[in-house]
């Protein structure tokens, strides 16, 4: 029997993000998930190695790679709709859960329990870091769009920056203080 899990995961590159906004450059959930994994790994390293608090960078990065996997089946629901009210938010969480279970069902039985925590993150510390990395990735997208002259992202940048600040996560605060402004630099300025 041919299992379809990885073939379906590879289709993440066809699911676009920011569907309600005019984009200077398109972003798909595969690209986004990679950036979230890089950021989650970095945040966890900051937490562990700089702030001397427990964190598992590898688990955070792995969970981040799959954090939007359910969208292969659901598509990317725009944030204003997803969080419009508590009922819609709850219903969408249920849809995501069903989607993740469907994805797990596409794996051989012996692999399902290994992938379950990646698709249904249950460790609150890992989930918090992945959530911060997800929001940080969204903010970086806004910064890049604004840098390209796309004012469409002004409100999203402002709201996302506020949401990041309100997370009160020390590793995120450290990242924002020491790394975030570099995303506004040109290639020549980065060297």
Regions found by a protein language model. Name each.
Residues 1-191:
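Alpha-helical, largely C-terminal catalytic domains
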């Amino acid at each position: 029997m041919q299992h379809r899990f990885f073939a379906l995961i590879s289709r993440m590159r066809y699911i676009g993000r920011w569907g309600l906004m005019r984009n200077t450059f398109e972003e798909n959930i595969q690209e986004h998930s990679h950036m979230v994994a890089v950021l989650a790994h970095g945040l966890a390293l900051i937490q562990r190695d700089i702030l001397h608090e427990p964190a598992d960078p590898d688990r955070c990065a792995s969970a981040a790679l799959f954090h939007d996997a359910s969208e292969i089946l659901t598509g990317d629901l725009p944030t204003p709709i997803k969080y419009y009210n508590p009922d819609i938010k709850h219903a969408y969480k249920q849809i995501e859960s069903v989607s993740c279970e469907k994805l797990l069902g596409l794996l051989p039985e012996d692999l399902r329990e290994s992938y379950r925590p990646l698709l249904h993150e249950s460790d609150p510390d890992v989930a918090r870091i992945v959530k911060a990395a997800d929001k940080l990735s969204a903010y970086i997208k806004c910064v890049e769009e604004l840098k390209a002259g796309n004012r469409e992202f002004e409100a999203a940048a402002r709201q996302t920056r506020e949401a990041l600040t309100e997370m009160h996560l020390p590793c995120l605060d450290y990242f924002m203080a020491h790394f975030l402004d570099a995303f506004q630099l040109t290639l020549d300025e980065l060297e």
